[in-house]
Design a protein with these regions (language model features):
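Conserved catalytic-core segment of NTP-binding enzymes
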Residues: 3, 31-37, 41-47, 56-157, ...
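Short His-Asn-centered micro-motif
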Residues: 25, 53-56
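Loop/turn-to-beta-strand initiation segments
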Residues: 18-22, 46-52, 79
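N-terminal phosphate/diphosphate-binding loop that engages ATP/GTP or pyrophosphate donors
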Residues: 1-31
C-alpha cells in the first residue's frame, strides 16, 4: 500500500524484513486494504520498538464519532494516539464527521453547526479514547490556530503538522 515502504503480508516475509527500521504489515483484504498482521501484535512489539496500529477508519472524513464497538484497541497497546484532520474545522458537522449524528450529540451541537476546536474537544473528551493527539493537515495559519485552540481544551500531549508538507510541532 505504500510504494517506498516494505510490506510483510506473511510471517516468512516479516522474518525476512526483521532488520528493516520501518515496515508495514498486514494481511490482504478486499478493496486493496490490509487487515490483521500475519503474527500477533505482541510478537510485533517484541521485534520492534514501536508498533503503530490503525484501529479504524473514518470513511474519508477528517472527524469521527466512534461506534460503541470502536476502535478495537489491542490488549498490548501502551498508547492511544488519536489522529484528527484539520480540514474539518469550519465545515458543517454533517459534512466533516463520520457518524455525524453521534458526533453532534456528543458535541452538544446541531448537524449544521460548524466543527470548531471546542466541539472537537467535546467529542474527544466524551469518548475518552486517546492519551495523545496528532492534528494532521495543519497547512494554513487558520489550521494552526485551530490546532492551538484544540490543544488548550485538552490535558494530554498534542502535536500538529502536515504529513504532506513534512512539518511537525508539539503544542502541548
Amino acid at each position: 500500500p505504500f510504494p517506498d515502504l516494505p510490506c510483510a503480508r506473511t510471517a516468512a516475509e516479516l522474518n525476512a524484513l526483521a532488520g528493516e527500521p520501518l515496515i508495514c504489515t498486514g494481511t490482504d483484504a478486499p478493496g486493496g486494504k490490509l487487515t490483521v498482521p500475519p503474527v500477533s501484535l505482541t510478537e510485533l512489539a517484541r521485534i520492534y520498538d514501536y508498533v503503530l496500529v490503525e484501529a479504524d477508519g473514518s470513511a474519508g472524513r477528517p472527524m469521527k464519532a466512534h461506534a460503541a464497538h470502536e476502535p478495537v484497541i489491542p490488549p498490548a497497546a501502551r498508547r492511544r494516539l488519536l489522529v484528527v484532520g484539520a480540514s474539518g474545522f469550519g465545515l458543517p458537522i454533517e459534512k466533516a464527521a463520520h457518524r455525524p449524528e453521534r458526533y453532534a450529540a456528543l458535541a452538544g451541537a446541531a448537524l449544521t453547526d460548524p466543527v470548531t476546536p471546542q466541539t472537537q474537544a467535546a467529542v474527544m473528551l466524551a469518548e475518552n479514547l486517546h492519551d495523545s493527539v496528532y492534528l494532521n493537515q495543519a497547512e494554513t495559519p487558520t489550521a494552526w490556530a485551530a490546532a492551538e485552540e484544540l490543544a488548550r481544551h485538552l490535558e494530554c500531549p498534542v502535536a500538529a503538522g502536515s504529513l504532506h508538507q513534512g512539518v511537525f510541532r508539539r503544542l502541548r
